[in-house]
Amino acid sequence: MQVILAKHAGFCFGVKRATQLAFQAANIGSETYTLGPIIHSPQVVQRLEEMGVIPVDNVSEVETGGTIIIRSHGVAAEELEAAVRANLEVVDATCPFVKKAQEHVATLSKEGYDIVVVGDAVHPEVQGIVSYAAGRVYVVSSHKDVERLPRMSKIGVVAQTTQSFEHLHEVVAACLARGGEARVYNTICDATAVRQEEAKKLAGAVDCMVVIGGFNSANTMRLAQICLELLPRTHHVETASQIDEQWFKGVKKVGVTAGASTPKWIIDEVIDRISAIDKDKIS
C-alpha cells in the first residue's frame, strides 16, 4: 500500500511563527499565558501547558507583570487594549495574514465603508477581525446571506484567511449585484489555497484519504470537506490512535494531508500507523 503525503501538509508560516514564540516563552520559565488556545491543535496546547504556558479566556485572569501571548487567530481589539492597560508583557503571535485583514477593516471603516466579512461568525479569527470595524459590519457565510443584508452604498469586503477563493468570489459577485461601490481585499492565506488545491489533486489520485488536524480547526475541516466531496473514503483524524485498519481494506494508494495547525510529530505518527497496518496485512 502506497502512502502519499501532500507536499505542504502541516504548519503554515503563521502557525509555525506562533508556536515558536510560545515555546520560546516557555523556555524562559516566566509566568506565561495564551489568550485562548495558541493554535487549533489540542495536542500542541497540551504540550505547552506541560511546559507552563497556560491558556486563559480573559486578560483579567493574568496577574500584573505576567506575559500573555496573543494567539495566531488574533484577538478582539478591546482584548488587546485590556492587556496593555493591565501592564502585561504582550507577545503578539497573530498571523500576519490575519493582522492584515484587521488593518483593512479598520481603514475601510474609517473611510465610511460598511464591512462584509466572509467567514464563520463564531470563529475567533472572525470575531477579532470584526472588532476593528468602527461602523456597521456583517459576517456572511455564503452569497445567499448577502441577499438578506440592507442596501449599502459603500461596501468593504475581506475574508477569513481560511476561506476558499471561489467562496470569496461568489460573495463579492453577490455584493456587486446589489449595486453601489465595493472595495475588496483578498485576505485569504496563500498557504490555505495551496493546501486546498493539493488536496483536490491528491484525492483524485488515491483510493482513500486521511486528513489530519484538530476537530476545531476550520482549515482542516475545509480540507476534509474538499476531499470528501471527491472521495467518499475520506477520514478526518486528530491523532494516530483514531486510525481504523478497516478503512484500508482493498486500498492500494492512501493520500495524507494535514491542516495548517497540525504539528509534524502527529503527521509522522499517523503515517507510521498506516504503514504498520500495511505490514500487518502483508504478514
Swiss-Prot record:
GO terms for biological process: dimethylallyl diphosphate biosynthetic process; isopentenyl diphosphate biosynthetic process, methylerythritol 4-phosphate pathway; terpenoid biosynthetic process. It comes from the Bacteria. Dimethylallyl diphosphate binds at residues 40, 73, 123, 217, 219, 261. (2E)-4-hydroxy-3-methylbut-2-enyl diphosphate binds at residues 40, 73, 123, 161, 217, 219, 261. Keywords: 4Fe-4S, Iron, Iron-sulfur, Isoprene biosynthesis, Metal-binding, Oxidoreductase. Coiled coil: none annotated. Catalyzes the conversion of 1-hydroxy-2-methyl-2-(E)-butenyl 4-diphosphate (HMBPP) into a mixture of isopentenyl diphosphate (IPP) and dimethylallyl diphosphate (DMAPP). Acts in the terminal step of the DOXP/MEP pathway for isoprenoid precursor biosynthesis. PANTHER family: 4-HYDROXY-3-METHYLBUT-2-ENYL DIPHOSPHATE REDUCTASE. This is 4-hydroxy-3-methylbut-2-enyl diphosphate reductase.
